[in-house]
């Protein structure tokens, strides 16, 4: 067994109300014992264990907090969308059009490029305090490209999400139902060994609520856990579909109604807010405050 004692902590945030009666559970002048990578003890520095400690780290009065959890990332991609970002900053409309450009770049990228790009982003997240991270597919949109994206992602995190239903790719624009059949059939079967979650972009320019329900239920029938991109571009039924299916989360939720908020408040579904996507649209922050 390996044991590490972090001592001389100015403030330790435990998220255990038993310590100070608040949700943060702050302990002043604290210590933390880690055994085999797992927190084994937390408490006042004066009460810290002293036996069988193989490593001691002096926090020098700094704060120690739980690691950040990033539950929504799109790391499996190639290329960039700087032109789209510029357009959005100039106030031009966005209806998920930039996704198609990234799909083209991702399909043409090697496994090595996808892996190194994702690893670089992952390292950056870890260096900023993230300890648990989710990675989605969704920029391949073919059976092979979605499978290889998730196969690579699974080597980087335990939390992988199948997002074959990101948008309908250009080759299926005239027959979107055929793409839904592909996602719920051969594509789903191909990615099953490499994913835990299934996600759908249920919004304007992406998938209707009926198609989203069909796709999510197909994944759930195979043991995947549901989540959604919902109500990013306009109000719709995505949030309430997430509640209906007991989804782990509905993400973005930039446009929500009172009915959406009421549905969320009585459910187990978490609303994941992504404020970085709203920089060009500051007026939308008001609706986010209602969700909070």
What annotation goes with each model-predicted range?
Residues 1-49:
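N-terminal metal-binding scaffold of metallo-dependent hydrolase/deaminase domains
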Residues 5, 54-58, 160:
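Conserved beta-strand scaffold positions in the cores of enzyme catalytic domains, especially
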Residues 9, 32, 37, 61, ...:
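Divalent metal-coordination and catalytic microenvironments
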Residues 44-53, 242-244, 263-264:
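Short loop/helix-cap segments at secondary-structure boundaries that form the rim of catalytic
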Residues 59-117:
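Metal-associated gating/positioning segment near the N- to mid-region
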Residues 100-119, 123, 131-237:
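Metal-coordinating catalytic core of metallo-dependent amide/deamination hydrolases
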Residues 126, 191, 220, 243-246, ...:
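Non-catalytic positions within long, well-ordered alpha-helices that form the structural scaffold/packing
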Residues 225, 235-292:
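Active-site-adjacent C-terminal substructures of enzyme catalytic domains
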């Amino acid at each position: 067994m390996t044991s590490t004692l972090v001592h001389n902590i100015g403030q330790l945030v435990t998220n255990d109300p038993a310590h100070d009666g608040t949700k943060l559970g702050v302990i002043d002048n604290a210590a933390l014992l880690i055994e085999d990578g797992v927190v084994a003890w937390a408490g006042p520095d004066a009460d810290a264990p002293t036996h069988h400690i193989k490593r001691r780290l002096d926090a020098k009065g700094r704060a120690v907090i739980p690691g950040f959890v990033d539950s929504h990332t799109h790391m499996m991609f190639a290329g960039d969308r700087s032109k789209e970002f510029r357009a959005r900053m100039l106030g031009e409309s966005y209806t998920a059009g930039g996704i198609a450009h990234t799909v083209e770049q991702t399909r043409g990228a090697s496994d090595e490029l996808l892996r190194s790009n994702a690893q670089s982003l992952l390292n950056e997240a870890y260096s900023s305090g993230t300890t648990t991270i989710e990675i989605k597919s969704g920029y391949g949109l073919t059976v092979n490209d979605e499978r290889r994206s998730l196969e690579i992602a699974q080597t980087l995190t335990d939390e992988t999400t199948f997002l074959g239903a990101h948008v309908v790719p250009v080759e299926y624009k005239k027959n979107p139902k055929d793409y839904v059949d592909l996602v719920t059939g051969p594509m789903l079967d191909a990615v099953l060994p490499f994913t835990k979650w299934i996600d759908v972009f249920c919004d304007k320019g992406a998938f209707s609520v009926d198609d989203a329900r069909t796709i999510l239920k197909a994944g759930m029938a195979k043991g995947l856990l549901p989540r959604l991109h919902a109500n990013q571009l306009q109000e719709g039924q995505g949030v309430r579909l997430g509640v209906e299916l007991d989804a782990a989360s509905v993400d973005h939720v930039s446009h929500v109604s009172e009915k959406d908020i009421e549905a969320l408040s009585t459910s187990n579904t978490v609303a994941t807010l992504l404020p970085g996507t709203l920089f060009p649209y500051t007026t939308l922050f008001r609706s986010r405050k209602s969700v909070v």
